[in-house]
Amino acid sequence: NIKRGSILGYIGENGAGKSTTIKLILGDMKKDCGEIYIFGKKIEELSEDEKKKIAFVFEDFFFPQDMNIGQVEKFHSIYYGKYWEKEIFDKLIKKFSLPNKKKISSFSRGMKMKLSLILALSHNPELLILDEATSGLDPVARDDILDILLDFIQDENKSIMISSHILSDLEKIADEIAFLHRGKLIFVENKDKLKEDYGIVSLSKEEFESLDKNSIIAVRDHKFGKECLVKKELIPQNLEVENASIEEIMVYMIKEKYDESLNI
């Protein structure tokens, strides 16, 4: 359930099912069971106009390499018709200094990704879905992409779902995090609440043995004892608990699980 006016970060290891979810939304795969609802309707019941309110941006590029920006824009304007916003397109092309006359084949990866995102935004979608859109980009290009997304989401009727292995990007922009593991949704949680609820604590063997085991999510052995992902509220105040990043929470839950009842 992606809330309007929010960004959902979709995380999980390779093979967890993130891209499969996106392919199901796109209609490239048939589901085995369950239903997918978008705009309050089953995805199979969406009209062509409603489908054009969804935009996708992928890690790979599908532009004819011998085209320039003007030719790509013309193709998209014909396809999207009344939904196409040339003013938005021209504004973003100018903002990011993309060359109108050069062939797409001469573009860097960062330039191609910016063009992909600009094209997606220029038919005024209500739902924007990105699959590894910042993968392989340098930090400056990634930051530019994140700025575009944050501008887009200022409209509270818009929503973004972004699947990424670069979890530091999601730390910056996501409102909620959905964690998928082996095809199972482990949690959907507010990002700030995740960081408030979980932490990492280093313990001697004696401290570990005396700790309330209900507080422990995952454990990693180290030279001096144990390092644990814990529920902060159950940890004694005399122990120093470090903040856990989203990446640490995911890795600990997958690799170092302590509580078998978590069913991860």
Feature roles, as predicted:
Residues 128-129, 207-211, 234-238:
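Short, surface-exposed beta-strand/loop "edge" segments at domain boundaries and coil↔beta transitions
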Residues 70, 167, 208, 246-247:
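Alpha-helix N-cap/helix-start and coil->helix boundary motif
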